[in-house]
Amino acid sequence: MKFARTIRFDKSDLNIFPVAAEEGELALVGTFSFNNIQNEDLKGKVKQAFSNGFIGCSSFGYSTLVSLVTVNEDDLINLQYSFGQYFIEHYGAPSKIIAEKAASEEIKFMSELCKDHELGSLLSVSREWSEEGIKEKFRNLPKADSCAEQKIWTVVDED
């Protein structure tokens, strides 16, 4: 099954988000993490996380980009359990059953988002406030051809 894993090309995420996700952790869309924030409260690093961040599933930090990878069913079961615990501890979910159901819905949403894209491609998210609430847009950046196959210089004999 395809799923998202955080990826970092440079150190910018470390500087722009309140907490940056670790590279290589599974990720969810994470819009739920902004449910209790009003538009006027979005400033600085929190605004950046709101506008362009996926949430990492181990650190609960944010990542600008995710790469599509293959995961197995056990990975997703473990993710459902750990995110269920996170919903109880940080969002006050009233029970383990309700928390794990919410986690399962978030996992399903990410799986659906990933399923039609090629492994190795990248996804980005863009969020904004609208009259109906939070509006999300996703962009797929197709997998680039291997750099090894590209000619980056030419050797010229000198006389």
Q: Predicted regions span which residues?
A:
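A ubiquitous short alpha-helical element
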Residues: 67-73
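Charge-rich, solvent-exposed alpha-helical interaction surfaces
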Residues: 45, 49, 53, 82-86, ...
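Intrinsically disordered, low-complexity regulatory regions associated with ubiquitination proteins
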Residues: 76, 88-89
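Alpha-helical oligomerization segments
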Residues: 107-159
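Short, surface-exposed acidic
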Residues: 89-104
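Short acidic alpha-helix initiation/capping motifs at coil-to-helix transition points
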Residues: 75-83
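Amphipathic alpha-helical interaction segments
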Residues: 57, 61, 90, 94, ...
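N-terminal accessory interaction module
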Residues: 1-66
